[in-house]
């Protein structure tokens, strides 16, 4: 499952999509495209940032960007993004969302220690 935590974030970044459990949201790409097209319009072109923390854990592949062209997510454009390259205001919003939705953490692959670390993050 997934939650869209931001739209028209900044510049080319059109949306942020967060995994809300152990399933990778990229397995629901058609549903994501439908929801993003409803929010942004079917002619939207830009970048989508995926936070896969709940699906992948606090690993090197937590953040991935994909291009969206005219409402379609282009899977062949996937790029892994280092956490240091994610703007602080986005990290802060993601942490805020996780703190307010403990069910996301409970449905994730995160260990109890990982959950404590996520909840103690401060941006």
Curated annotation (Swiss-Prot):
* Record's note on what induces expression: Not repressed by IscR. rnlA-rnlB forms an operon, the downstream rnlB also has its own promoter.
Keywords, alphabetical: Toxin-antitoxin system
The UniProt function text for this chain reads:
Antitoxin component of a type II toxin-antitoxin (TA) system. A labile antitoxin (half-life of 2.1 minutes) that inhibits the endonuclease activity of cognate toxin RnlA but not that of non-cognate toxin LsoA.
Please name the GO terms of the biological process aspect recorded for this protein, alphabetically. regulation of DNA-templated transcription; regulation of growth; single-species biofilm formation
InterPro entries the UniProt entry points to? RnlB/LsoB_antitoxin (IPR031834)
Its source organism is Escherichia coli (strain K12)
Q: What happens when the gene is disrupted?
A: Essential, it cannot be deleted unless rnlA is also disrupted.
| Post-translational modifications | Probably degraded by CplXP and Lon proteases.
Quote the subunit structure annotation: Can form a complex with cognate toxin RnlA.
Under Pfam families, the record lists: RnlB_antitoxin
Q: Which domain of life, per UniProt? A: Bacteria
Q: Name one GO cellular component term.
A: toxin-antitoxin complex
Protein's UniProt name: Antitoxin RnlB
């Amino acid at each position: 499952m997934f939650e869209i935590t931001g739209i028209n974030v900044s510049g080319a970044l059109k949306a942020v999509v967060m995994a809300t459990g152990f399933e990778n949201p990229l397995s629901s790409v058609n549903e994501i495209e439908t929801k993003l097209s409803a929010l942004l319009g079917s002619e939207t072109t830009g970048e989508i940032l995926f936070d896969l923390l709940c699906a992948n854990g606090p690993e090197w592949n937590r953040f991935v960007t994909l291009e969206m062209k005219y409402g379609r997510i282009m899977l062949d454009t996937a790029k892994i993004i280092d956490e240091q390259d994610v703007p602080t205001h986005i990290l802060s919003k993601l942490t805020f969302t996780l703190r307010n939705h403990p069910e996301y953490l409970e449905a994730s692959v995160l260990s109890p220690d990982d959950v404590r670390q996520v909840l103690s993050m401060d941006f």
